């Protein structure tokens, strides 16, 4: 769905309209595997949302696979079946969304609970309005087989599933710290 007229010249279109045209052409292809690299780059939020809605409702069916690379993970998080992070050509993270939702937990703690939360060895920590948000991997060596779980973490503060963007920051920060130390 677009507002581009049939008699429009490509050279007269805005960058966003050229992107809309390109995406319409891509979606017209009947392919079992569709690879989209930053498909909504240059589109405003309204057209990005419409594109993903069309992609899922008009294009996708169970016989097709769609691979999307994007820096705007938050706009597609709710439609993903799997997530993968790549750093310098190497896969550094790969899991299903089902595993993601059961495995990763963020806890927002007050300063009084911060030391107890840190003792559980989170994979990442960031400050937030005078409190700390700690991200845990419940399947890590300190997680699934350890002495804490999601319910026990809730005694330390507010517990929720992290966004993919927050997990990305944690994984990449740890990756860069590890590879930087190895050099």
Give names to the regions the model predicted:
Residues 52-141:
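ABC transporter nucleotide-binding domain
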Residues 1-87, 93:
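ABC transporter nucleotide-binding domains
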Residues 26, 112, 173:
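Residue-level marker of positions within ordered structural domains that often coincide
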Residues 4, 91, 105, 155-158:
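Short N-terminal micro-motifs specific to bacterial/archaeal maturation
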Residues 34-39, 114-117, 141-146:
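Short, surface-exposed beta-strand/loop "edge" segments at domain boundaries and coil↔beta transitions
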Residues 22, 32, 105, 173-177:
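Generic structural signal for secondary-structure transition and capping sites
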Residues 129-183:
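C-terminal coupling/interaction segments
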């Amino acid at each position: 769905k677009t507002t581009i007229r049939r008699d429009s010249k490509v050279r007269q279109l805005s960058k966003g309209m050229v992107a809309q045209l390109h995406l319409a052409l891509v979606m017209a292809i009947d392919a079992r595997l569709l690879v989209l690299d930053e498909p909504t780059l240059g589109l405003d939020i309204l057209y990005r949302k419409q594109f993903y809605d069309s992609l899922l409702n008009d294009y996708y069916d169970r016989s097709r696979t769609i691979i999307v690379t994007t820096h705007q993970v938050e706009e597609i998080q709710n439609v993903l079946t799997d997530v993968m992070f790549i750093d310098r050509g190497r896969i550094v993270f790969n899991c299903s969304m089902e595993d993601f939702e059961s495995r990763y937990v963020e806890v927002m703690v007050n300063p009084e609970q911060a030391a107890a939360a840190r003792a559980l060895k989170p994979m990442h920590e960031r400050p937030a309005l005078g409190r700390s948000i700690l991200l845990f991997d419940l399947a890590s060596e300190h997680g699934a087989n350890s002495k804490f779980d999601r319910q026990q973490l809730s005694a330390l503060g507010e517990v929720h599933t992290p966004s993919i963007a927050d997990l990305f920051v944690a994984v990449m920060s740890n990756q860069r710290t590890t590879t930087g130390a190895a050099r």
